[in-house]
Amino acid sequence: MFARSVSVGLDIASDAVRVVWCRSRRQGWELLGWHSINVPAGTFQGDRLIAPEALRDVLSQIHKILPRRLARLCIALPGAAVMQKTLMVDAFLTEQERLFRVEAELPSLFPLPPHELAFDFRAEGAETANGRLKLVVTAARRELMNDYLAVLQGAGLQADIVDITPLALRRALEQAQAALPPALELEQQLLVHLSARNLLVTSVPGSPLFFRDQPLNIPQSEGNSVPPALLQEQRLSEVTRQLGLIRQMYHSTGRQSSGLLVSGQLRESDTRVLSTQLSVPVQGWSPFAGLSLAVSVPQQEDAWPFTLACGLAVWEGN
């Protein structure tokens, strides 16, 4: 159907699997399709996959609707499952030498044996005056990653890229940036993705990576006797509380945020409350903004669930 330039972003969440597929064109990305399928209750416990067969069945359905020829399929590990540390090295080291150095330092960086970790690293910032360079080392349990990859394989899919959700969120905003208000000072914003059960906050593209992925400590609506209006009020209160704490953590790094860019499950009235309580402007945005469209897309208030899948689909690495 399409040339082998189709890139697929697959967001595996505890409530649903969401997929976006795009084609890279000279003038940018073209959206070719998007879809979601709910995940049966009990498939996940928090971020832990406890019923792989149920997830495999959902992924098999997803596989059937995707184009047959793909350039890449990108998934992401949840931010809460990821550990991150920094390491200073000599700037003159080659990439291979940096890898050896990171491997040697793994026992002191993370509280798990090195053989239990899957890790990656990247340079951040410029070389210091004394010839040093900061490496950001990201790691996750190898068992967790292998669980996801095995389920994908069982559904006939293969992940070419395993990313992390904070970077997917940043990338989604990066491709939608042209649709944001011109007067917005992007470097002063924090990115927020609010799902039914989690709050993901990260710094904007182009800045040093900061992120927090927090579960929302509120009752879920399924089988709950609490009135929906009260549940919504409790949820908004919890989101406001956690965002306040995360902004304090961010400011403690020496950076400031004067606004929030939110993709998530928020009504317009909730956005106003959030803005008032935190004393900052809150701006919504659509992950599909900035894409040329070969298919129709949902309105902004319904587009937010596809934010991470969209950010994964527009991955531009090699």
Where do the model's predicted regions map?
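Hydrophobic/aromatic-enriched cytosolic interaction surfaces used to assemble or bind macromolecules
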Residues: 1-318
